[in-house]
Amino acid sequence: MDETSADQGAVRLVHDDDRDRFAAYEGGTVVAVLAFEDEGSVRDLRSTVVAPERSGRGIGAAIVRFALEDSRERGLSIRPTCWFVRGYIERHPEYADLLETPETAPDKE
């Protein structure tokens, strides 16, 4: 597990590179996961899942923001496959510069 983490109130956010995910913990319990796959210089943010009983508390937004900041620090472009991530970036245009472009897309040859 990557030691990159941040505290968001009672929620701890962790970059779990071994499992290709970001995770949000309350105590020792995983309450949200954002799955990704790195393809060269592009990080595909594939899906975001928040435990139903934790929905509506901003945990999804916090984990997406954490993933975007981590990607920025690592110099990665973003492919927002996940609808929740796409919506977050639309509402927060300060992350639009991270979006994958034809120049940053990995070769598919």
Protein language model regions, located:
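Conserved acetyl-CoA binding element of GNAT-fold acetyltransferases
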Residues: 42-52
